[in-house]
Amino acid sequence: MITTPDFQGTHLWDRLCWAKETLEPYRSEYCVVWEDQEEPDAPAKVTHPDPNWMACAIQGGILPPVEAYWELKKDEAKPDFTKHTRGYLLHNTKPIDAMTEERAIEYLIMKDLPSHVWQNWDKANKPRLVICTKSQLPSTRVWRNAWKISEELTITKQEVA
C-alpha cells in the first residue's frame, strides 16, 4: 500500500496530480442513474466515477470533505457571483480518510449531482436516483434520449458503514 503524504494545505490540483502519477486507476463497476425533477422531459442521466478520482477516494488523504464543495455551490448560487474566492476550502481543509467503493459513490453523488436530486431521493412518487452496475444499463445507446428510471423499480435501502 502506498502511503499518502500529509496533504493538508496542499493545493487540490497538486494532490490530484500526485495521485495520477502514483496511484493505479480504479475502474468502478458502479454508476449512478438519476433524473432531475426540474427537467421532467429530459432523459435519465448517467454518472460514472473517473478511475483516477476513484483511486483518490479509496486511497484516502487526498480529497477534501464534500462540505467544501457545498460551500462553493452556495457561492455560485448568489446573484452577484462572478468567480470563486474561497478556493482555500478545497486546499486547506483536512483531506478525508480512505473510503470504500460504496462510500465513494455516495460522496460522488453529493459532490456532483444537484442537491435537490439526492437530498430526498426516496420521498418522491418514483425513484429519482439509482446506483447500479454498468452491466445493468442497456448495452446499446440506441434510444438513449428516451431512457427513464422505471416507476416499478423496487428500492432496497442499505446502510453503508
Where are the regions a protein language model picked out?
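Interaction-interface detector
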Residues: M1-A161
